[in-house]
Amino acid sequence: MAPTNAGDPGRLPATSTEGHLMAVPQNPPPGGCGQRIALVNGSFEAPVVTDFEIRPDASHNDPRAVPGWRTTASDGQIELWRTGFLNVPSDDGRQFAELNANMVSTLYQDLPTTPGTKLYWKLSHRGRLGSDTMALQIGPPNAPVEQARMTDGNTAWGHYTGEYVVPPGQTITRFAFKSISAAGGNPAVGNFLDGIIFGTAPCVVLTKTAIPEGEVEVGDVITYRVNAKNEGGAPADNLLLTDDIPAGTSYVPGSLRVIDGPNSGGKSDAADDDQAYFDAETGRVVFHLGDGATAQQGGRLASTTDAPGGTTVEFRVRVERAGAGREIENQAGATYDNTLGSTPDHLTSTSNATATPVKRVVELTVVKAADRTKAAVGEAVTYHVAVTNDGPNDATGVTVFDQLPEGLTFLSATSTAGGYDPATGLWDVGAMDVGTTHTLTLLAKVTQPGSLTNAATATANETDGPVTDEVVVCARPAAPCPPHGGGCGCGGGCGGC
């Protein structure tokens, strides 16, 4: 399965009206890019040299050898230059090669190929002392065919691109540069080469993981990581990765990071100041990835031939109450370009979908009672509050709000867990295991007559709303007592609510 043409850059899988991700198959899946054909060390970045050095080609069993490249020169040597040596800048990376090392020769790589495969090539060429000429040859190793001839002066790099379809029966293809002529006539001088690409189209594979892997609770943080690997042969240009914040969660500010690959490190949430940002309006994180990526556009992701690990990004979300009892689903997408053809080809990739189950909301019950339903001003009333965690999960952050109404004065409080603050009316219970009950006893004095309603409201981090129970005490005025005792208010009371 190959990457698809981009219709809507940055577009992700659709979301249903219930907020669930309508996941689509991962495209392409790992190993789904077909045969990868790519040069090794196309920009001559290895081995690292200081100014210039002549090193053995890849046919030598020598740690100093140049990876990937071979030469027809009888001495088997390849010349590498560091950018800026003799005031000659590289065109790609920090190093480049000189085709004429100690003699006129051909530089090449032989690659396994499948007949019918479309390959793309790109190169940079420059003269050393003046105008130098070389030929690009592609074909079977015993008889490569000249595809193009390039002549460039020594003041700027020339850039060339093209396409090649592997003919029937050709299972090994040679990609070669043959020195034709060089200014000055010295066989050891001429024809600089850099930024060479030859291979299949880019093919970015996105692999997504969610940490932790198992069930989470409301309030937990999920870390999403997305790895992007270019399993094609050519580089993926203008790489843009996007990921919608899933329903039932909220983005954790400041959590954008490039874990590994180009431009690794933490990124700000704001747009236009580094290679990533969080778009609060659309609820989406955006990463510009690859070498040369900026705040405005994506960069270049090399083939896994040169960048085996690709690049990995990370961001975090917090599970909200709306996510309780459901699966938090997430899927990332990417857009990128194949810029090696006659016209740029816009491609898309989709990651695998992750699904993180969230525990259901905790059910609390609260019961409020009083030791009497009628009392006189000046008498004490004892209130009892019981809160129970009915499950199905443990509860955290359990609190009960029980503010004494006007007409009652707080005397004392005792509880089996946490403490009660009479100033705020808050009983901080804390964590409760499934099936646990905690109680609070409040002693209050009646200070004025009337119907005194006292309510207790319980909540927890995992509940979907508060639960309340209340009790009403009928407070009557305190009647004066006759001089010798007895009578209304002294032995049985009279009047009432």
Task: Give the location of each predicted region.
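Short acidic/polar mixed-charge low-complexity motifs
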Residues: 103-105, 117, 143-144, 436, ...
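Generic hydrophobic, helix-prone segments enriched in Leu/Val/Ile
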Residues: 60-63, 69-71, 78, 97, ...
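Beta-strand-rich interaction surfaces with strong enrichment in secreted/lumenal proteins
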Residues: 96-98, 107-111, 147-152, 161-164, ...
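Short edge-strand/loop segments of extracellular domains
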Residues: 136-143, 243-248
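Exported/extracytosolic protein signature
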Residues: 2-3, 10-36, 199-497
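Aromatic (Trp/Tyr/Phe) and Gly/Pro-enriched flexible surface segments
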Residues: 19-118, 122-124, 129-139, 150-199
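Sequence/structural signature of outer-membrane beta-barrel proteins
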Residues: 145-146, 160, 182-184, 339, ...
